[in-house]
Amino acid sequence: MAKEDVIEVEGTVIEPLPNAMFRVELENGHKILAHVSGKIRMHFIRILPGDKVTVELSPYDLTRGRITYRYK
């Protein structure tokens, strides 16, 4: 998948799930399942419920995404 094909949206973490997965509510109201990107995992950045995050979505499956940034 090419880097240009991703859709970047902002959302809020609702609940943590097992295996570094999170339920995220997007700004448009949709709820998706998101996992943590490798760089965030590598730098031990904690993601808690209520955090604002940026999520990358694939155009092929809009119900799953990757958390790429946590706002301070």
From Swiss-Prot:
Domain S1-like as annotated: residue spans: 2-72
SMART domains per record: S1 (SM00316)
Leader sequence segment: none
GO CC field: cytosol
Pfam families documented for this protein: eIF-1a
The keyword Cytoplasm is assigned to this record: yes
InterPro entries documented for this protein: NA-bd_OB-fold, RNA-binding_domain_S1_IF1, S1_domain, TIF_IF1
HAMAP family (UniProt xref): IF_1
NCBIfam families documented for this protein: infA
Quaternary structure annotation from Swiss-Prot or TrEMBL: Component of the 30S ribosomal translation pre-initiation complex which assembles on the 30S ribosome in the order IF-2 and IF-3, IF-1 and N-formylmethionyl-tRNA(fMet); mRNA recruitment can occur at any time during PIC assembly.
Protein name: Translation initiation factor IF-1
Lineage: Bacteria, Bacillati, Bacillota, Bacilli, Bacillales
